[in-house]
Amino acid sequence: MMIWDWNLSKPSESIKKHSGTWDKGIDYKQTYKMFKEDLQKLKNKELLYEDDYKRIAYLITFLFQLRNGCRIWEAIAGMINIAINIDNLNWNERITVKVRTQKRKDWEFRELIIPKCIKKEDIEMVRDVFLDIKKEIDEKLTMDEKLKAKKKIVKRFGAWLYKNYGINTHSLRYAYVTYLGEHGIPAQVLAKITKHKNINYIETYTQSRLAKEILKNIGDLDD
């Protein structure tokens, strides 16, 4: 399978630590259902404008990100790889795609799986949207230009999500982490799934979320 990314040479991006203000505490199941229903509504109507196809492409990408607990660029790169390999994939089985893990200095790839609700015909409908995104990167000549184009694309996706849903892309990643933590998945396994290098961070995050839920839901004797 052909693997594409903006940069497949040795990673050199610096790792930035997040302060935690990005985490909006969104619910995984509610968000998944919301994206899925909005996607279906779009598919059921007559698509007249280019923005309709872009909206479908964006919703597919965010469903993809949410389902895998990945970073937004990993989801975008994953969708591009699916688009360019669409006819070489076995759509009778669950589709997985490899992408380069972002924010890592080591040479690390991860597998992402397409949500069951996303079908081949959905990708075919918006394939050109993802190929155009790929072209935005490929037409740049230097690595600095490619990096700037990548950041611009990520910003565009993030702005669209915030404008339409009031949430940020990183919250989708941690909604999945929280969801798996609620199902008793150990921090070590969570780190492997989401490609977090810092297991202690995952432990602290999931324990903090659990502590908030316990404080909120356990102790009242008024009912």
From Swiss-Prot:
Domain of life: Archaea
Recorded coiled-coil stretches: none
Catalytic residues as annotated in Swiss-Prot or TrEMBL: 71, 103, 170, 173, 196, 205 (o-(3'-phospho-dna)-tyrosine intermediate)
Alphabetical keyword list: DNA recombination
Domain Tyr recombinase: 29-220
InterPro entries named among the record's database cross-references: DNA_brk_join_enz, Integrase-like_cat_sf, Integrase_catalytic
Swiss-Prot/TrEMBL GO biological process terms: chromosome segregation; DNA recombination
GO MF annotations in UniProt: DNA binding; site-specific recombinase activity
Family of this protein: Belongs to the 'phage' integrase family.
Name this protein carries in UniProt: Uncharacterized protein MJ0770
Taxonomic classification: Archaea, Methanobacteriati, Methanobacteriota, Methanomada group, Methanococci
